[in-house]
Swiss-Prot record:
Cross-referenced SUPFAM superfamilies: Release factor (SSF75620)
Keywords, ordered alphabetically: Cytoplasm, Methylation, Protein biosynthesis
Pfam families per record: PCRF, RF-1
Descriptive protein name: Peptide chain release factor 1
Role played: Peptide chain release factor 1 directs the termination of translation in response to the peptide chain termination codons UAG and UAA.
Record has Protein biosynthesis as a keyword: yes
Designated gene of the protein: prfA
Matching PANTHER family: LD18447P
Location of this chain's protein in the cell: Cytoplasm
Organism: Lactobacillus helveticus (strain DPC 4571)
Modification N5-methylglutamine occurs at: 236
InterPro entries: PCRF, Pep_chain_release_fac_I, Pep_chain_release_fac_I_sf, Prokaryotic/Mito_RF, RF-1
Family: Belongs to the prokaryotic/mitochondrial release factor family.
Post-translational modification: Methylated by PrmC. Methylation increases the termination efficiency of RF1.
GO molecular function terms noted in the UniProt entry: translation release factor activity, codon specific
Amino acid sequence: MDKVMAQLEGLVAHYEELQEMMADPEVINDTKRYMEISKEEADLREVVQKYKKYKEDKKEIADNKEIIANETDSDLIEMAKEENAEIEKEIPELEDQIKILMLPKDPNDDKDIIMEIRGAAGGDEASLFAGDLLRMYEKYAERQNWKVSMIDSEPTEVGGYKRVAIMITGDKVYSKLKYENGAHRVQRIPVTESQGRVHTSTATVAVMPEYEQVDIDIDPKDIRVDVYRSSGAGGQHINKTSSAVRMTHLPTGIVVAMQDQRSQQQNREKAMQILKSRVYDYYESQNQAKYDAKRKNAIGTGDRSERIRTYNYPQNRVTDHRIGLTINKLDRVMNGELDEIIDALILYNQTKQLEELADQNA
């Protein structure tokens, strides 16, 4: 904890500098700079407040010990002892909170995401489950006051999806949904099953941070752009003009199709935005040394083929295999009540990081 405390002293000094800068008229008049400083100040606020409370508690304990050692009034001594007993209960919890707040932040945690859900093993039932997962994430996003927009999809005749891609925007979306990467298994009796037998199917979920233009630069020569007539909803206009856009990143073979915007230019811009995220994600995933180190003590590997969760409908049960968590409220989970699972995953990851930090400091 001593090393952490030494870091915190510097952090408090920097936090106070940021507050002074935010009151500087020159900074106030520079909107971009003010927003950057304001965000950094907000990011540090909680850990600084916790540390100040920790120091206050430590000082109060020391003051009370002095009273206990030097005071002759028995009532004052007893009061000081009682106060210290209460404060000393707070200290370990404060230390843990500070350690967690000081853990290295995932630089992508504040980002919006692109999520792809694919029906995998199980045919029609897998595609139906992909649709169920889509609705589950849509309802969860609604509970978080996030916005969901459709990118593209391949619906199936039975009402599911062979593949569906959505964008979710809001506050710290990636920080909560990054743990959804992997294979999701469902056990249930399909509507087409006449014998009442339970079938097992899977759908895969891929979660990618939405990267801004500054994060990655793609050579225009590496992109092939095809335009074609849009299909589906949109009225007569959408079928009369070649407004749909398909972009192919030649070095990786990644393809993005976009047709939900009204103009070709809008579809181009959105397709490029999504293509950049997918290309960046592709190259990041190739860097195994970096990922292995990053995920050494993380939850699973984040591999999209790794089975992470089972949804058992007959028993109304959900099991997350990475942390051994089982909850018997599948109906509520599928209705978007994912907080219990996601909070447990975040806590597990933080605990593993703290253990690694303790090993390094040992």
